[in-house]
Amino acid sequence: MANLLRVLMVAEKPSIALSIASVLSHGQMSTRRGSTEVHEFDGMFRGFKAHYRVTSVIGHVFSVDFPEKYQNWATIDPQDLFDAPIIKKESNPKAHICRHLSNEARGCSYMVLWLDCDREGENICFEVIESTGFDMKDSKRKVYRARFSSVTEKDISKAMDNLVEPNRDEALAVDARQEIDLKVGVAFSRFQTSYFQGKYQNLDCRVISYGPCQTPTLGFCVQRYMHINTFKPEKFWALRPYIRKDGYELQLEWERRRLFDLEAATVFQKLVVEGRTAKVMDVSEKQEVKGRPAGLNTVNLLKVASSALGFGPQTAMHLAERLYTQGFISYPRTESTAYPSSFDFTDTLRAQVSNPVWGGYVQRLLSDGFHMPKSGTDAGDHPPITPMRAATEVMVGGDAWRLYQYVCQHFLGTVSPNCKYIRTKVELSIGGETFHCTGQRVTEKGFTAIMPWSAVDEKKLPSFLKGERIEVLRVELYEGNTAPPDYLTESELISLMEKHGIGTDASIAVHINNIGERNYVQVQSGRKMVPTALGITLIRGYQCIDPDLCLPDIRSFIEQQITLVAKGQADHSHVVQHVIQQFRRKFSYFVQQIEHMDALFEAQFSPLADSGRALSKCGKCLRYMKHITAVPPRLFCGTCEEVYYLPQKGTVKLYKELTCPLDNFELVIYSVPGPEGKSFPLCPYCYNSPPFEGIDTLFGASKTPNAPAKTKTGAGMPCSLCPHPTCQHSVRNQGVCACPECEGTLVLDPVSFPKWKLNCNLCSCIVLLPEGAHRITTTSNRCPECDSAIIEIDFNKKTTPLENGATLHQGCVLCDELLLSLVEVKHGRSFVRRGGRGRGRGRGRGRGGRRGSKSVDPKMSFRDF
C-alpha cells in the first residue's frame, strides 16, 4: 500500500458511504469503526492504483451561531445581533466528526466528495474541505466532486467517471441564508419572547419565535382564517328541473347557475313550470384528453403525501430520504419535473417487472411500447423522483411502502398513454330558459389504470335526438347559502409557499413543521392547518405594525438574491449586508411600535396579575406569589413583576413553609403522579437562576427531566442538584449514593412515605426502599467501605425485619446485607457488591462530596463535584 495513491471519499450519511464502497469495491472491502464507519479497499483511480478510504459525515459538519458573549438574553440588546459576528461550530461535538475527517485525510492525495447534490450538499463539501485540511488551490492534494442522483451501481459508476469541482457559489448561497436567518430570527424572537414572557396567564410564551420563512407561512394560514371569520353568507336560489328519459331520471343544470334575488328566481320558476316540456336544442360529443402527469418533484410529492397518504411534510421527507439512502428511489429533493434526454426509461421499467402488484402492467408497457413523458420543468438540479429498484412492503415497511408505491405508480403514469374519454353535452330549452346535462364515457384508461385516483368519473346519459320534446316531471327552486372556504390544508399551504417562493424543496417541510411545534397552528382532521390564538394574534400584530414582516414578498426577494449568489451573479457579502440593513430598520420600528401588538395580546390573553392562586412567598419582597398552572407553569410575583418557571407535567405544592438559605424564597415540592413518579423540592429562584457556575455543563441541566426551556432565566436546578452545604434539602445532605445507571446521585425522596424511595437526580433510575417504614432519613455518617451516606430506618413494629421486634436500624444501602435484600432498583441495574463497594459511577460519593469533611464554597464551579 506504500506505493499506492490514497483517496479519501466522503458521503453525507453512513448508509450512502456503504453503498458507494460496496459498488466501487465490488463488495471486496474491509470496514473499521470510527466516528462513522470507514470502508477500505484497493482499486484504480484515474489510471493509477489506489487505496480508498470511504467514510461519511452525518449532515452538516458545522452550524452557525453567535459567540458566547452574545448568548446572554439579559445583557445583550437584540438590536446588537444584527451587527454581531457569527461563528461556525461543530453541529454535533460528541460525534467528533472534524477530528475523524482530519485523521482519515492524513496521507491522502485526493478527496472525492459524495455529498447530496443540492446547495446544502455543496455547502457541506466546503465544511469537509475545511475539516480535512485540503485546499482547492493546492495542486498536490486535489479535491473532486461526484454528482449523482441515486445510489445505484449505474449512477455511482457514472459519477466516478465524471468527477467535477465543488461549486463554491452554491455553498456561499447557503452561508448567506444561514446568516440572514440566524440574525433576523434570533433578534426578533428574543425581543418578542422577552417582552411577552410573564405578562399573560394563558399564553404559552416559552419561545415566541419569528422566522423570515416561518412567519409568512403562518401568515397564509391566518389569512385563510380571517377570510373564514369575516365571511358573510348570502342566500341564493337555483332552478332544478327533472326529466325522465329511457328510464333515467335526470336533473338538469341551469345555464344561469344561481340568482341572489328570490323574486327574480320565482319569476323564472313560473316560466319553466308553464313550459311543461323540454325541447332538445343540441346534442354534442367531443373527444377529451386527460394528459399523463409530468415527472414527480419534491413539492408535488409532499402535496400528495399530505392530501392522499395522510403524512405531514416532515414525515414524508424522512420516509423519502430513507428510501433514497436504501437505494429504492432517486434523490428526493428536486424542483425538476422534466427528465433529462439521457434518462434510461427501459432499464427503470425493467426493474419493476418483478413487482407482484404492477409487474404485469410494466410488462405490457415494455411489450406495447411506453410513451415518453410530457415536457416539464428542468430546474437543472436532479431528475424527477423515480423508483430505482424493486421493493416489497416487507422490505421497506408500512408507511415507507405507501410512499414508495406512489412514487412507482406516478413514474409508470408518466410513461403511460393519456386518458381519453368522450364528453356528451345535451342542451335543452324549457319556457325560454336554457338547461343542460352532461355525460362522460372513457374510451382509453391510459395512465389512470395505474393511477386510479386520477380516473375520469363516468356518467352515462340516455340517447337524445335534436328537436325531440320531453315532459318535465317537476321544477324545484333550490335555496342555498354561499359558504366560506375551508381552512388551508397542508397541500394547499405547500402550493402557496411554492407560488410565492417561500422556502425551497429542501426546507418547505421544516417551515410547516416549525409553525406546528411553536403552537402557532394545529393540524386537524383532513390535514387542515388551523391557527391558534397565539398564531392569529402574532400575525395581526405584525399587520398592525409592519405588514411586510408576515407577507411573502420579502422572503421571495431574499430567495431571489440568494439564487443570484448561487449562480455567481451576486456577491455573497453584499447580499447579506443589504438584507440585514433592511431588517435592522424594520426591527427598530417594530420595537418602537410593540405596544400595538401588546394591545392585541391583552385583548386575547389574561394578564398574570389577574390570574392564579397564592402559593409561596417571594424571597425579595416577602409577598405571596401566584401559581399559574397554564402551560408553561410558573410563579408570578406581582410586587416585583418577576416570573419564575416551574417543571411541567406534575403537581406543585408548598413545602412545609421551608425557605432556601441562599435567597429566602419559600420552597415548593414538585411531584409526578404514579407509583414510579418522582418528587423533589425546589427553590423557584435557584431553579430559574442557578447560583453555581457550571451546573448546566456538569449535569446537563437543560436535559434534566421537566426543566424549563432555555430562556434568559437559565436552566432548571432543583434542590436535588444543589451542592449547598448548609441546606438540608441539597444533594450534599439528601444524597445517598451513586446512581448505578449514570453519573448522577440517588437522593432520598422526601415525600414518598409510605412507599419510600431514592431518585436519581439525573436519570429515571429509582430505588424502592422498605415499604411502610414510619421514617427514613439520611445521617451525617458515611459508610467506611464505599463512602455512601448511612440511612436510618424506623420500621413499622408489625412488619419489622429486625430481631426481637426492634424497629430502628442504620446502614448503607450498598453494603448492609439486610438493606441490600430489601431494596429494589427500577429503570436501572441492580446494585452488585464488588469487593465491599457498591456499584455506581455517580459524581461524588454518597452525598456528592469527596471523602472527608472539607467545607464547600457555594460559588464553586462544579468541576470537582
From Swiss-Prot:
Residues forming the catalytic site: Y331
Domain Toprim: 6-151
Co-factor(s): Mg(2+)
Record: residues binding Mg(2+) 2: D116, D118
Keywords, in A-Z order: DNA-binding, Isomerase, Magnesium, Metal-binding, Topoisomerase
Biased composition annotated in UniProt, kind: Basic residues: 833-853
PROSITE patterns (UniProt xref): TOPO_IA_1, TOPO_IA_2, TOPRIM
Site (Interaction with DNA): residue numbering on this chain: W73, R190, Q197, R333
Disordered, as annotated region: 833-865
The organism's place on the tree of life at top rank: Eukaryota
Stretches assigned to the Topo IA-type catalytic domain: 167-587
EC number of the protein: 5.6.2.1
Database matches in InterPro entries: Topo_IA, Topo_IA_2, Topo_IA_AS, Topo_IA_cen, Topo_IA_cen_sub1, Topo_IA_cen_sub2, Topo_IA_cen_sub3, Topo_IA_core_domain
Region span, Interaction with DNA: 209-214
Reaction equation(s) it catalyzes: ATP-independent breakage of single-stranded DNA, followed by passage and rejoining
Biological processes annotated in GO: DNA topological change
Chain intervals with Basic and acidic residues compositional bias: 854-865
Gene Ontology MF annotations: DNA binding; DNA topoisomerase type I (single strand cut, ATP-independent) activity; metal ion binding; mRNA binding
Homology family: Belongs to the type IA topoisomerase family.
Known role: Releases the supercoiling and torsional tension of DNA introduced during the DNA replication and transcription by transiently cleaving and rejoining one strand of the DNA duplex. Introduces a single-strand break via transesterification at a target site in duplex DNA. The scissile phosphodiester is attacked by the catalytic tyrosine of the enzyme, resulting in the formation of a DNA-(5'-phosphotyrosyl)-enzyme intermediate and the expulsion of a 3'-OH DNA strand. The free DNA strand than undergoes passage around the unbroken strand thus removing DNA supercoils.
UniProt name for this protein: DNA topoisomerase 3-beta
Taxonomic source organism: Arabidopsis thaliana
Organism phylogeny: Eukaryota, Viridiplantae, Streptophyta, Embryophyta, Tracheophyta
